[in-house]
Swiss-Prot record:
Record-level Gene Ontology MF annotations: enzyme activator activity; RNA lariat debranching enzyme activator activity
Signal peptide: none
Source species taxonomy: Eukaryota, Fungi, Dikarya, Ascomycota, Saccharomycotina
Function, in words: Involved in branched RNA metabolism, modulating the turnover of lariat-intron pre-mRNAs by the lariat-debranching enzyme DBR1. Enhances the debranching activity of DBR1 in vitro.
Organism listed in the record: Saccharomyces cerevisiae (strain ATCC 204508 / S288c)
Swiss-Prot/TrEMBL GO biological process terms: mRNA splicing, via spliceosome
Name of the protein in its database record: CWF19-like protein DRN1
Length: 507
């Protein structure tokens, strides 16, 4: 059997020299490799890498201004741009399209045209983003239907992605209809503290199917099956337990209304105390029924007298996907009490208004609210920011549920109470507090559980309002904090909140 020995790594230009030195050591110790593939968010072809002593290198970079699909940098380094198919001398075929998530949908036609005419049997698929099917299987909210379509067409033996820069992930192998085995992996960036380089042997030639035995941990093809349980290898990271609201909700992205809801047990839920991986260093306050935590990858940033981001989550201790105010009156009041205490702190201590965002859906995993401080001079522009994002959602992203927000004058509005007490309703809601004394304005849009919703919608609206466009994604390098930074943030938040902490006065 003929094997190709391959190494896949993820580096940035700032750490390139150090990472290449380590790759050389790996090549000396565990190689020599036949091929090294390197992911990078950006790569300047004029940037020099000392690749002496290394085998053939493939560098991948997304540069839409560059229309070339490949370019030879030197004798053993090839730069691949944007998307295309590249065949090596040993017969290995690579297909790649490395556009980021925010441009994938717009490039869908060109991507499908590019690969739709190809009859090549692809060995390795290289993308920036994950496919939607595998993302949903893993409880992630990011994921692209475009990646799904190409993965199903190309049926590569290995699929590598690199959009998650901090987590190594390896899905158990699965099989296509023609008996070809496939594996999916996410490679984090060098410096993440996780496995940033992955080595493997791949049979090449006509005997690949015959030479590769069926692995004992073979799973159902994630592109063909509906996930109803969590049969996955966990992310190798302490940040798997993410205190970011958007990561805890699953939307139904299929038109099939009979699709089963994915069940997450409390022991595996990111927000449940029974989860042994709970990131308790981020907890601010624990009440009888509710607790308060800082947000993973906060949207807002310190401003003026506020030396914390102020972005926090109100979470029921009980594992409930959706809150029913008509049946959970005590819990509802406890959540609103925490909400009011934060509004008071933001206004009195930091001269800030407050906006609260929530998703009530039967397909959620663990209900919670996100609370974000907003400067007074910006809160009056909220409606404009909301209207803008609604327009994009309804007109540009045609697969999303069409959102139409209704405004209510208070929590006691009869029309509002009727909506939230009707458990058949699923909805997105913003609650805007200008002052602690005045009733808030509530903006609510209902949707059908079978419809696709943008789980980042609330964050997009507020990122635009706060003029923080680079902080839309909680897991971007701009937003993520180290564990030490998260601990310091929580300690500062606790200190600021102490005077307003309702858990200190609860019976």
């Amino acid at each position: 059997m003929t094997n190709a020995k391959i190494l896949v790594a993820h580096i940035s230009e700032s750490d390139a020299d150090e990472a290449i030195r380590k790759i050389k050591k790996v090549n000396e110790k565990s190689g020599p490799f036949d091929l090294i593939i390197i992911f990078s968010n950006s790569y300047d072809e004029n940037f020099e890498l000392n690749t002496d002593g290394l085998p053939q290198l493939i560098l991948l970079s997304c540069d839409k201004a560059n229309n070339s699909k490949s370019k030879k940098i030197n004798e053993n380094v090839t730069l691949l741009h944007n998307m295309g198919t590249y065949k090596l001398a040993n017969g290995i075929t690579l297909s790649y399209f490395i556009y980021p998530d925010d441009t994938l949908q717009g490039e869908k036609k060109s991507i499908l045209d590019e690969f739709g005419k190809s009859e090549d049997q692809v060995d390795i698929l290289l993308t920036k983003e994950w496919g939607l099917s595998i993302s949903e299987r893993c409880g992630r909210l990011s994921g692209s239907e475009v990646v799904d379509e190409l993965a199903k067409k190309l049926q590569a033996r290995y699929h590598f992605a690199f959009s998650d820069e901090i987590n190594f992930y390896e899905l158990e192998p699965f099989q296509w209809e023609r008996e070809r085995l496939s594996r999916f992996l996410n490679i984090p960036k060098y410096g993440s503290g996780k496995k940033w380089a992955y080595a493997f042997n791949m049979p090449i030639g006509d005997n690949e199917l015959k030479d590769e035995p069926e692995p004992p941990n073979l799973i159902a093809n994630p592109y063909n099956s509906v996930v109803t349980n969590s049969n996955k290898r966990p992310l190798e990271t302490e940040t798997e337990n993410s205190f970011d609201g958007d990561k805890q909700v699953l939307a139904n992205r299929e038109k099939n209304e009979n699709k089963k809801i994915r069940t997450i047990l409390p022991s595996s839920c990111h927000f449940c105390f029974s989860n042994p991986n709970l990131e308790d260093h981020m907890i601010i306050s624990i009440g009888k029924l509710v607790y308060l935590t800082t947000a993973k990858g906060p949207l807002s940033v310190p401003k003026g007298d506020m030396d914390i981001s102020g972005h926090c989550l109100i979470i029921p201790i009980e594992h409930i996907p959706k809150l029913d105010p008509s049946k959970n009156a005590e819990l509802t009041q406890s959540i609103l009490a925490y909400e009011a205490s934060l509004v008071k702190m933001n206004y009195i201590k930091f001269d800030m208004c407050t906006i609260v965002f929530e998703i009530q859906s039967e397909r959620s995993i663990h209900f919670h609210k996100q609370v974000i401080p907003v400067p007074k001079y910006l809160v009056l522009k909220f409606c404009s920011a909301l209207d803008r994002q609604v327009h994009f959602n309804n007109e540009k992203f045609t697969r999303n549920a069409k959102l139409e927000f209704q405004c209510y004058d208070s929590h006691s509005s009869k029309q509002y109470v009727d909506v939230i007490n009707n458990q058949s309703n699923n909805y997105l809601q913003f609650t805007v507090y200008e002052t602690p004394e005045a009733d808030p304005k509530i903006y609510l849009a209902t949707f059908n559980a079978s419809e696709t919703i943008d789980l980042q919608f609330g964050r997009r609206v507020l990122a635009f309002l706060l003029n923080l466009p680079r902080r839309v994604k909680w897991n971007s390098s701009t937003c993520l904090q180290t564990k030490q930074q998260e601990t310091i943030e929580a300690e500062k938040f606790q200190k600021a909140y102490r005077t307003y902490d309702i858990s200190l006065t609860e019976n």
